[in-house]
Amino acid sequence: MTALTDTPTWQTLASLAEDVKQQHMRDWFASDTSRASKYQQTACGIELDFSKNLITDDVLKALFALADESQVSQKRDAMFKGDIINHTEKRAVLHTALRNFSGEPVYVDGQDVMPEVLACQDKIKDFVASIHSGERKGYTGKALKQIVSIGIGGSFLGPKIMSEALKPYWFDGVKVHFVANVDGCHIQDVLANLDHEETLVVMSSKSFTTQETLQNTLTAKDWFLNAGGTQQDIAKHFIAVSSNIKAATDFGMAEDNIFPMWDWVGGRYSLWSAIGLPIALTLGYDNYRQLLQGAFEMDEHFKTAPAEQNLPMLTALLGVWYINFFGAQSHVLLPYYHYLRGFPAYVQQLDMESNGKNISGDTTAVDYATGPIIWGSEGTNGQHSFHQLIHQGTLLIPADFMLPLNVPNQDNTHHAMLASNCFGQTQALMQGKTFDECYADLEGKGLDEAERVKLATHKTMPGNKPSNTLLFEQMDPKTLGSLVAMYEHKVFVQGAIWGVNSFDQWGVELGKELGNQVLDKIVNTDAALGFDSSTNALIARFRQANS
């Protein structure tokens, strides 16, 4: 056993789990009418109902003790202070500085980074104003109304999904298109109907060498030049978010149109940096600032609220409870709001890239489960497909249901139906339906006894399936910022308990490295193949098909 699993608190939780597995939530609700109010907390515009979880007061007490013993609070404070907590890359982790509205300095290696952060935000503000006012024009004098944002990973998911989620707040007159996949179909589809004279390309790559992003940007450049632009005109139509100023200027971009990035901001946390420029172009700068404000308020909540009231702490500990003591391998996110449909994919990268690790900080292989599979879809679509597995499958799959209570400019009938389905699903998962209830429902249906018993058996729902429900007054920029930051800090807490580095991604780096090696063999068709027999055969087949 490692130190974590050998602790008395871990053993207490294991014992409590065995006890809880013999109980049913429907009985808890029947015997305690205050359960819903007891297990509910509100902060930063988010109402968290966690009463439909397999928890008791004793379970929560032990989970809070686990967090204390894992020094979660101390690790949290070290992150906010700018200590080197990404130990494998020897970096601070300070995406929180990008939404720091406190007026207090934030230090990295003894230097206050806030002047740089504020200068970048001012640059974003001025740039957005110049686009929205029509002051900034293309080489023929047309206003730049079509924005093509090219990135991948955090440089794509964050801007795209935040922009989608806030569609009611879009600025009228500018349209932002997002491109990530190196599959040429994607960039071709986006560019096909655009006028190059009113198109601005935003290339987001810290190194300016990210394979997919660079190729898509080169394709956009060829499209621009073939449509009538010249190399000299590139500076008016292409800008970058990058640390590699030389590569960007060599490409043809003006140095004034290059926005900075910092090593202390990881890609999956980068939407708060200039990577979020497409969000500001989509929403307007004031709404973009509200997004940052919401995240800042969640940061303050995370730092100051006691564990029993702390939304990131509560959601993280519930996840640890199911992953490590109930064998849960996945967690499903179910936003009952069409514009939030991409949110599961955002959290998927955030969580799985952060905590998909098997080595603890002291280089010991862990002997317990870490990051779960994150997946999900918008409600009510999922009810007609994969919810069946959650209801009657053999796997325990904790769920997060999300619902804005009010939606601007929508028929109330639609929203009432949406809400009823959301709440009904949480009840059905918790309560289930007993054999006796199913058997009684079949009375008078013309079935003989054997058929009635058989069908009732198939219709029985075990229930006892855990879920959180997160309600918002409405999904505005500030609330979305708080929601994203809540999940960021949830992931941090879980990584702190498991003792893994939540801020590197060596699996991603290996994929890039091998992808480049294979590309070299595909392009250089005379080169000898030196991989395993399967990979060699796949490359040979591709060469043959494209000869």
UniProtKB/Swiss-Prot annotation:
Keywords: Cytoplasm, Gluconeogenesis, Glycolysis, Isomerase
Cysteine disulfide links: none
EC class of the enzyme, as a word: isomerase
GO cellular component, one term: cytosol
Presence of the UniProt keyword Hydrolase in the record: no
One annotated GO biological process: glycolytic process
Molecular function GO labels: carbohydrate derivative binding; glucose-6-phosphate isomerase activity; monosaccharide binding
Domain of life, per lineage: Bacteria
EC number in record: 5.3.1.9
Residues forming the catalytic site: E353 (proton donor), H384, K512
Similarity section: Belongs to the GPI family.
Described function: Catalyzes the reversible isomerization of glucose-6-phosphate to fructose-6-phosphate.
Protein name in UniProt: Glucose-6-phosphate isomerase
Source species: Pseudoalteromonas atlantica (strain T6c / ATCC BAA-1087)
